[in-house]
Amino acid sequence: MPRSLKKGPFIEFKLEKRILDMNSKGERKVVKTWSRSSMISPDFVGHTVAVHNGKTHVPVYVTENMVGHKLGEFAPTRLYRGHAGGKAEKGGSAPRKK
């Protein structure tokens, strides 16, 4: 269920303050954050935000297409390594001993 329009989007106060300070100074530094639930605003475009995925901080370069999405959508938390088991030989199973 989306957030109520009367409340407005959630953006962590410190994160928004850092981005606005960097915009006024013209800086482009990586901003480290744990706030995966923060909405990406148009002020974030062009900045790199390091979003925590539970283990490390994943650098996310913000583009115009990302505005309105949440930061956590671009930092996957699960790593798929494939299903268990090795490669099967052609021709069936190994020969049986009698």
From Swiss-Prot:
It comes from the Bacteria. Keywords: Ribonucleoprotein, Ribosomal protein, RNA-binding, rRNA-binding. Gene3D superfamilies: 30s Ribosomal Protein S19, Chain A (3.30.860.10). One of its GO terms (biological process) is ribosomal small subunit assembly. GO terms for molecular function: rRNA binding; structural constituent of ribosome. The keyword Transcription does not apply. InterPro entries: Ribosomal_uS19, Ribosomal_uS19_bac-type, Ribosomal_uS19_CS, Ribosomal_uS19_SF. GO terms for cellular component: cytoplasm; small ribosomal subunit. Protein S19 forms a complex with S13 that binds strongly to the 16S ribosomal RNA. Belongs to the universal ribosomal protein uS19 family. NCBIfam families: rpsS_bact (TIGR01050). This is Small ribosomal subunit protein uS19. It comes from Chlorobaculum parvum (strain DSM 263 / NCIMB 8327) (Chlorobium vibrioforme subsp. thiosulfatophilum). The lineage of its organism: Bacteria, Pseudomonadati, Chlorobiota, Chlorobiia, Chlorobiales. The gene is rpsS.
